Amino acid sequence: MRRALAAAAIGLLLAGPALAAPGKPKPLGPPEQRLTVAQAKAIFLRNEKVSDWLAHYPQRLWQTDATFDQDHKFWRVNVWAGEAGEVATGKVDDTSGAVSEAWTGPQVAWKMARGLPGAFGGKEINSAPVWLGFCALFFLGLADLRRPFSLRNLDLLVLLSFTVSLWFFNRGDIITSVPLAYPPLLYLLGRMAWSGWRGRLGTGAVPVWPIWLLAAATVFAAGFRLGLNVRASNVIDVGYSGVIGANRIANGQSPYGHFPVELGKACGPSDIDGETRERIQTNGRCESANPQGDTYGPVAYEAYLPGYLALGWTGKWDDLPAAHFASIGFDLLCVLGLALVGLRFGGQRLAVTLAFAWVAYPFTQYVSSSNTNDALPPLFLIWGFWLATWPAARGVGAALSGWTKFGSLLVAPLWASYPERRLRPTLVFAVGFLVATLAAFSILLLEPNPVHAARVFWDRTLGWQIDRESPFSIWDWRQYHAGLPDLHILQRVLEVLLIVAALAVYFVPRRKSPLQL
């Protein structure tokens, strides 16, 4: 009996292929989509975040489109509203029917407005324990604990109050985040103007802690910051642009007009949105695109040359060790410069206090953890201030700072008239400024036609930035929906007043103290 069953089983196994032979196997295709176009649109429009934002626009202006991504099984939904353009976009999961992403207003065009976790600086610096730890160290280390309602303590709290704006920024709530940054900015502007006019700060007592304790805290905080940068930070597009610019200079090109773009043959994978950043560039290399990265002054790229020459660049937007090297260097040089400034103008206590203030302030670490070039302008101003009695050094510092990011060019008239408005020191300042400017712009000589290179520089930097729209200030918000004011006229008026004020401080006061400088 057992032999019969075994023989039958073997026969069935052998017969199986023969029985299946007459018909070809039918390939298994991808499963059909579950939702229809209309259903995907309706689900997205019912999302609370989307519906709240769309309420700002007349429904008759809405135009909605939905496309299905077969590979990832989701619907991409886009909504337009007349002249406002695209006002909402997101994803609907086809399997569950849930809205997996919903971006509205400024979040549509600006991914940095979406509040993605750790997008700026990494998750560690943005975590509550680390951030609030820096806040506590900064306040307790510098506060006048004997007088809790002193002006010094108010100044410190205002400096820390930018945390509220950052908290909303990290949630992707730009419409709330941006206005919250203006009250502390206005306070600090008024505070500095009043102190400069009076010639004294009026903050009273020095920190209560002994020098050795502040010095120890400074060393500890500096080491902790270094560890955060090396192990728990990221490099945003600003730091990436510095490395690209250094690469172009080292290879005999001006950075302007030579940044990697998304036009050549793809040489890397596409992301979930179908965007392929890595492309073959005109130099034949596979590089990650950063098409608008050449918008800063020349010093913003030249300062990355040491890091690039030491650590190189793969062509990709990867860990970018050269950017980390530069960012850490900028940070430490600011600390050293502040210590020297304090030592020169106030002795050991002020030296330690200024260094401590930098390493304890959370936003300086935010800059370091994001590996940007934002520490460069203050770096040159700090060292120029240290050498304030030498007009040429002030000129060099003002020029290098201004040709990194153009805003600090406003300090040039003030610095040119220190300690008083006299022709000879002003001329020496101008010579230092001119020499530093020529050195900074010498990279334009790397191009076959320096005049054309200068025009490209203008077009890629100030020419582009003047008309650039951004959601990270209130001036361009009118584009988003009805009810938001058009502030462009006010912006132009304030810009003119700012330039007038920058020129006026060359003349008033006639004699200036280091504090006023």
Protein language model features and the residues they cover:
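Transmembrane helices and adjacent periplasmic/lumenal helix-loop junctions
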Residues: 394-420, 439
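Bacterial N-terminal signal peptides
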Residues: 7-16
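Boundary at the C-terminal end of the N-terminal hydrophobic targeting segment
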Residues: 18-23
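Exposed beta-strand-loop-beta-strand "reactive/processing" segments of non-cytosolic proteins
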Residues: 52-95
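Juxtamembrane interface at the cytosolic side of transmembrane helices
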Residues: 131-160
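Short, aromatic-rich amphipathic segments at membrane interfaces
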Residues: 94-128
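Primarily membrane-embedded glycan-assembly and transfer machineries that use lipid-linked glycans
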Residues: 158-165, 169-210, 221-385, 392, ...
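Short, non-transmembrane alpha-helical segments in secretory-pathway proteins
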Residues: 25-68, 123-130
